[in-house]
Amino acid sequence: MKYCVVILALLVALVCITESRSTETGYAVAETLEDNDLDELQAYLEEIAEASEMEDFSNIEEARGFFGKMKEYFKKFGASFKRRFANLKKRLG
């Protein structure tokens, strides 16, 4: 168990170092982000902006919909992170 924690910490450190190097060497952010990822994020942020304009969260259905959208976004973010991590491993390996 200790080894798993150490390996995970090393992987996180490696990802952080790689990300900092990519900005220092001038890699474009567009290289790592696909256009449709940005479009999905923009559409989602627009939905969140509309949802945040609700005046009253006392309506349970509206609140449930808002938190459902948040949950969906974090699932997409997790999948996107896994894909980017796999791409990072390919570039490093």
Curated annotation (Swiss-Prot):
Post-translational modification Leucine amide, affected residues: L92
Top-level taxon of origin: Eukaryota
GO molecular function term, any single one: toxin activity
Propeptide: 23-64
Keyword Ribosomal protein: no
InterPro entries: Latarcin_precursor
Pfam hit, one: Latarcin
Main location per the UniProt record: secreted
Family classification: Belongs to the cationic peptide 03 (latarcin) family. 05 subfamily.
Function per UniProt: Has antimicrobial activity against. Gram-positive bacteria (A.globiformis VKM Ac-1112 (MIC=1.1 uM), and B.subtilis VKM B-501 (MIC=0.6 uM)), Gram-negative bacteria (E.coli DH5-alpha (MIC=0.6 uM), E.coli MH1 (MIC=0.6 uM), and P.aeruginosa PAO1 (MIC=18 uM)), and yeasts (P.pastoris GS115 (MIC>37 uM), and S.cerevisiae Y190 (MIC>37 uM)). Also has a moderate hemolytic activity against rabbit erythrocytes. Causes paralysis, but is not lethal when injected into insect (M.domestica) larvae.
Entry note about domains: The mature peptide (65-92) probably forms alpha-helices which disrupt target cell membranes.
Name of the protein described by the UniProt record: M-zodatoxin-Lt5a
Taxonomic classification: Eukaryota, Metazoa, Ecdysozoa, Arthropoda, Chelicerata
